[in-house]
């Protein structure tokens, strides 16, 4: 893991086209601004994990149900 220290209004770059800027520091919270191409998916980690879990649940289907659909 790379550790980088930034102050308010300072940025860091990921690759050539993703810029993350520290906008606000308050009460143990950090507000970040992310400038990235529109086709780049950006999710908070907790939302990413929830989506990943739902996708796993969707993969666990009863094959007998599928056999009934085939008729």
Swiss-Prot record:
Q: Which InterPro entries match?
A: CsrA, CsrA_sf
Q: Where in the cell is it found?
A: Cytoplasm
Q: Which domain of life is it from?
A: Bacteria
Q: What is its main location?
A: cytoplasm
Signal peptide span:
none
Gene Ontology biological process terms in this record: bacterial-type flagellum organization; mRNA catabolic process; negative regulation of translational initiation; regulation of bacterial-type flagellum assembly; regulation of carbohydrate metabolic process
Which molecular-function annotation in GO is an example for this chain? mRNA 5'-UTR binding
A Pfam family this chain is assigned to: CsrA
List, alphabetically, the GO terms of the cellular component aspect: cytosol
Which keywords are on file for this protein?
Bacterial flagellum biogenesis, Cytoplasm, Repressor, RNA-binding, Translation regulation
Could you tell me what this protein does? Answer: A translational regulator that binds mRNA to regulate translation initiation and/or mRNA stability. Usually binds in the 5'-UTR at or near the Shine-Dalgarno sequence preventing ribosome-binding, thus repressing translation. Its main target seems to be the major flagellin gene, while its function is anatagonized by FliW.
Quaternary structure and interacting proteins, as annotated = Homodimer; the beta-strands of each monomer intercalate to form a hydrophobic core, while the alpha-helices form wings that extend away from the core.
Q: Which family does it belong to?
A: Belongs to the CsrA/RsmA family.
List the PANTHER family hit by this protein, alphabetically.
Answer: CARBON STORAGE REGULATOR (PTHR34984:SF1)
Q: What is this protein called?
A: Translational regulator CsrA
Q: Which organism is it from?
A: Clostridium botulinum (strain Alaska E43 / Type E3)
State which gene encodes it.
csrA
């Amino acid at each position: 893991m790379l550790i980088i220290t930034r102050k308010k209004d300072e940025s860091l770059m990921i690759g050539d086209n993703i810029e993350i800027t520290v906008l606000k520091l308050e009460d143990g919270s950090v507000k970040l601004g992310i400038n990235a191409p529109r086709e780049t998916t950006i999710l908070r980690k907790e939302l990413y994990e929830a989506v990943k879990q739902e996708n796993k649940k969707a993969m666990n289907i009863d094959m007998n149900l599928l056999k009934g659909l085939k008729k």
